[in-house]
Amino acid sequence: MNFIKNNLANAFTLGNLFSGSIGVINLVDGNYKVAAVCIIISLVLDFLDGFVARALKANSNLGAQLDSLADMVSFGLLPGVTMFKALEGFGNQFMDFELPFQLKYLGLFVALFSCLRLAIFNLDEEQSYYFKGLNTPSNTVLLFGMYYAFQETGMFWRTFENPVFLVGLIAASCWLLISPIKMIALKFKSMKLKDNYPKLILLLGGILLILILGLAGIPMVIVFYIIVSLIFQKQM
């Protein structure tokens, strides 16, 4: 019984890794719909591993390390491959320049900065009730959400048909991952309204964006999340 209690959260973490790995493989093959399902599964399992570990009081150093390693694939490599695929059709042309490398490899910088962000997070003891910088799951939802909406509906076409915008999006993503900006975490210090109204604004605004914009609303929720976090810096 103790074995199950001590390792149930780790099983969810490994499930996250397994799902993320399948997502990466399918995304490379162009099966972005399968990749989308894998991201959803990984997001759910990433939530469950932490929830179960806290509920069973089974937090461990092993679990923390496994969590970061799994997240590196599901929310580091996968969004990096997303931007790799987004830039794939542009060859080595950028503006009026012919680069000595294929432009698509710049997408993998998202994976590099995700790795750096996860390492920083592991060493930072301050991020209990807020994040410093954009967390990797949110970054994945932003980048893949935009890519998926473009593939399905043509939304964000100005970004995905222009390599300058795509490179700018990658640069912004990389900076946000390691920035010192405080970001809201959906963890509650208390049940008092004054302590939680930024979170309530975020939740209600996010629901409205998805209801109004549909698919395009999913990445816009992350943009809204960044804006709300910037507004309420002093409350964190």
Residue ranges and their predicted role:
Residues M1-L17, R54-M72, L118-S138, K182-Y197, ...:
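Interhelical loop and helix-boundary elements at the membrane-water interface
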Residues N16, G20-G23, L78-V81, S114-R117, ...:
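Helical transmembrane-bundle signal
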Residues F12-G15, A35-S42, L106-F113, N139, ...:
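Hydrophobic alpha-helical transmembrane segments of polytopic
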Residues I22-V37, L77-Y105, M146-F165, I212-L215:
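Helix-coil boundary and interhelical linker segments in multi-pass alpha-helical membrane proteins
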Residues A9-T13, A55-A119:
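Multi-pass membrane catalytic core of lipid/isoprenoid biosynthesis enzymes
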Residues M1-F47, V221, F232:
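Topogenic membrane-insertion module of multi-pass membrane proteins
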Residues I25, N31, F47, F51-R54, ...:
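N-terminal TM1-TM2 helical hairpin plus the immediately adjacent luminal interfacial "cap"
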Residues S128-M236:
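C-terminal membrane-associated helical module and adjoining short loops/tails
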